[in-house]
Every structure is written in C-alpha cells, then in structure tokens.
From Swiss-Prot:
This is Methionyl-tRNA formyltransferase. It catalyses: L-methionyl-tRNA(fMet) + (6R)-10-formyltetrahydrofolate = N-formyl-L-methionyl-tRNA(fMet) + (6S)-5,6,7,8-tetrahydrofolate + H(+). Keywords: Protein biosynthesis, Transferase. It comes from Campylobacter fetus subsp. fetus (strain 82-40). The gene is fmt. It is an enzyme of class 2 (transferase).
Length: 304
C-alpha cells in the first residue's frame, strides 16, 4: 500500500482527502493544513475544513499545522513519514524544493493550466467570462503552478456561481486524484505552454465593491457570481447584494426603474440590474420587496 502525505486546507481539499481515505488503496500517513484561525465577530478559533475532516473520520492520522514549510524540522518530519506521494490541493503555502525532492508532489489545481495560475482560479475564470473550466493534476515544480501536466478534467461553467463551481470541481478533482495515483507510473507528463499562462492573486474584501457609474451590467453580474458568497457584491453605501440578475431596462444610474413581486431594478452604467435580496451593514439579509417597502422607496427614488 502506497503512503500519502496530504496537504490542503478548504472544502475543495476535504473532498479530495475523503476520496483518498475511502479508496482503501492508499495509506494517508499525515495531513498538513493551515493553522486554526479566528472566525467571525467573536473571533472564535476555528480549524480548517481539512482538519475537521480528519477529526471526524475517527482515523489516527497525525495533523501538522506549521506556519512555515521551510523549517528544517518540518522537512525532517515529512522525510520520516516516507511518503510515496505528496498530494496537494489548495494548501495555501508554496512547497520548498527540500519537500519537492522527498516524493512526487501532485497538485490538483482548479483551472485548465496554464490559465489562471495562483490563488483564485475559480473566481478568475468566472470574471473573465470563460465558458470552460476544470481541474489540472500536475507534478509540482519550484515555480507557481507551472509543473508538468499529468491529467485534467473539463466542465462547462456558464451561469455558475463560484460556490457552485467549487463543489463541481472538488468532485472532479477527487476522481482525477485517484486516477492519477493509480496510473502514475504509466503517465507521460506534458510540459505546460508557458507563453499562454496567466496568473490570479488572492481575493480581498474590497474586490466585491462595485461602481454602478463605471461598471456595466455584465461586469457586475460576473463579479456577483465570482465573489459569491465571499466577499460578496456590495455598493459604496455598504449594501450587500445577495441575489441579482441583469435587466433590459434603461435609466439613470442609482435610481429605481421598476418594482415587482420579487425585486426592484436600478440603473447602472449602460443598462440596469434587478436586485432580489440584499443586506444593509450590520443588519440581516432581506428580500428586495421588503426592503423597498421598509424604506418607502418607489419608482424614481434614488437607491444609491
């Protein structure tokens, strides 16, 4: 039975880890994940999803949460585990060469490489209006997501939110992981075409801010899907939009153009959007009709 060291942090990685644990053909000798972080207004110390998965499994798998993989003690810990493979999925740290040299390191990246190397490939694919996305399994090198390709899976992504695409790609990545592990010795890796590469950085809260005077309905709708549920889509007045769609009405930016049973429409640059649910800062989410009634807004009223 092959020994695996698994490295990952969010839900996406948990789905992959669960598939390896259920497969029965591999022995997960250790899991590396990010440290517990304070979450929410009360700053409750919360473990990452991968750690939760290990604890809930009831299996006696050592969990490591180092701040830095470059520490010599961490490298020695991994060497002592004698892994046949190191499987990496959205871990959150770059692996140093000392670890890459221990065993084949296989990364499951949530894009069709060489497109969208980096921290936010799912969000970036939606923002760019891509029709296809997918998962790429690669043999990791010292560069950022630039290793040789071992295999990939593809999915059509029109109209998907990032949360939905995360779920779909996680399931695809789980199946691809088992396939690559089973067939690793017979796979001929393919070098990436680096001239076609693109990069994407971490998503920040301010990325969800929209300017209705400058951004078109299509751009706003793409940002809504890309940043759902976090950081979300919000206006300069602090209102967060939880559900929306593009409208075909025309009118003045920021003003209410129409009201119906499931929302209200406001003018934006080059068109309009229909808001169906929203949330004021410090308050609960409400449906748009209740918001309009509570604020006593009507057609022609200024919303933002």
């Amino acid at each position: 039975m092959k020994n695996i060291v698994f490295m990952g942090t969010p839900d996406y990685a948990s789905v992959i880890l669960e598939a390896i644990l259920k497969n029965g053909g591999y022995n997960v000798v250790a899991v590396f994940t990010q440290p517990d972080r304070p979450v929410g207004r009360k700053a409750i110390l919360t473990p990452p999803e991968v750690k939760k998965t290990v604890l809930q499994s009831g299996l006696d798998i050592p969990i490591f949460q180092p701040l830095n993989l470059k520490d010599s003690s961490t490298v020695n810990d991994i060497k002592a585990l004698k892994p046949n493979f190191i499987v990496v999925a959205a871990y959150g740290q770059i692996l140093p060469k000392d670890i890459l040299d221990i065993a084949p390191c296989i990364n499951l990246h949530a894009s069709l490489l060489p497109k969208f190397r980096g921290a936010s490939p799912i969000q970036e694919a939606i923002l760019r209006g891509e029709l296809l996305s997918g998962v790429t399994a690669m043999r990791m090198g010292v560069g950022l997501d630039d290793g040789d390709i071992l295999g990939f899976s593809v999915i059509e992504i029109p109209n998907l939110k990032s949360s939905q695409l995360f779920c779909e790609l996680a399931k695809m990545a789980a199946k691809l992981t088992i396939k690559i592990l089973n067939e690793f010795e017979s796979i001929s890796p393919i070098a990436q075409f680096h001239a076609l590469s693109s990069k994407c950085g971490k998503v920040h809260k301010e990325d969800g801010l929209i300017d209705i005077k400058l951004q078109t309905p299509k751009i706003i709708e793409s940002k809504f899907r890309a940043y759902y549920p976090w950081p979300g889509l919000y206006l300069e007045n602090g209102v967060k939009i939880w559900d929306m769609e593009i409208s075909n009405l025309k009118g003045e930016n920021g003003y209410v153009l129409s009201i119906d049973y499931d929302g209200f429409t406001i003018g934006v640059n080059g068109g309009s959007i229909k808001i169906k649910s929203l949330q004021e800062s410090g308050k609960k989410m409400v449906n748009a009709k209740d918001y309009i009634n509570g604020k006593r807004l009507g057609v022609g009223s200024k919303f933002c």
